[in-house]
UniProtKB/Swiss-Prot annotation:
One of its GO terms (molecular function) is calcium ion binding. Changing residue 33 to A: Decreased calmodulin modulator function. Residues 1-39 are annotated as: Disordered. PANTHER family: CALMODULIN REGULATOR PROTEIN PCP4 (PTHR15359:SF7), IG-LIKE DOMAIN-CONTAINING PROTEIN (PTHR15359). This is Calmodulin regulator protein PCP4. Signal peptide: none annotated. Residues 12-28 have a biased composition (Basic and acidic residues). Changing residue 37 to G: Loss of the calmodulin modulator function. Residues 39-62 form the IQ domain. Keywords: Calmodulin-binding. One of its GO terms (biological process) is positive regulation of CAMKK-AMPK signaling cascade. GO terms for cellular component: cytoplasm; cytosol; nucleus; protein-containing complex. The gene is PCP4.
Length: 62
């Protein structure tokens, strides 16, 4: 349930910066090969760090 709250907070931030989306989309388009081994390794590393963060966050709130 706390994951949904985190996603809601992120969506709230996106709404405030949504005014300049038309200009930013042109600059932020990237062609990322999702099947590349280095992309998969990066995704695993990011997910691992996120899980550690969530575990630490859950432990400190109790």
């Amino acid at each position: 349930m706390s994951e949904r709250q985190g996603a809601g907070a992120t969506n709230g931030k996106d709404k405030t910066s949504g005014e300049n989306d038309g200009q930013k989309k042109v600059q932020e388009e990237f062609d990322i090969d999702m099947d590349a081994p280095e992309t998969e390794r990066a995704a695993v590393a990011i997910q691992s760090q996120f899980r550690k963060f969530q575990k630490k966050k859950a432990g400190s709130q109790s």
